[in-house]
Amino acid sequence: MLIRVDPASETPIFAQVAASVRADAAAGRLRPGDRLPSARDVAASLGVNLHTVLRAYQVLRDEGLVDMRRGRGAVATDAVEPLARLHHDIEALVARARALALSPDALAALVKETYR
């Protein structure tokens, strides 16, 4: 798993780390039971404070996507599977929208309208 952040972004680093893990889960690259890289390793590779990565992992824990246990690290939970299925469904929706020559803005408007 490769976690990427943009130091120039206005989005806090911890939020970018959490979003990167979520994206891997949605893409199916993170499966239930998979271990996330250690917070220490991620912090070192990104050149950020360890507590920044721990905060990201805590956010993911609070969302139910990872389980954190002392000595085991952060492990993906079963909650990552529905996220991957949703991503697959969205890809299929986008493909159907393209076949209908629907613009991304029009599709987004339909989704927003339906979501209400």
Where are these regions (language model features)?
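Extreme N-terminal segment that seeds HTH/winged-HTH DNA-binding domains in transcriptional regulators
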Residues: M1-R35, D41, A84-R116
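N-proximal short alpha-helices
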Residues: A15, V59-E63, V80
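Short glycine/serine/threonine-biased micro-segments
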Residues: A26, R31, D62, R69-G71
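Enrichment for repetitive, rod-forming helical segments
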Residues: R29, V42, G47, D62, ...
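Short, Lys/Arg-rich nucleic-acid/phosphate-binding segment
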Residues: R35-L36, L65-V75, A79
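N-terminal helix-turn-helix
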Residues: R35-V66
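Short, structured secondary-structure boundary patches
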Residues: V48, L54-Y57, R72-V75, H88-A95, ...
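Short, glycine/charged-enriched secondary-structure capping and boundary segments
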Residues: T52, P82-A84
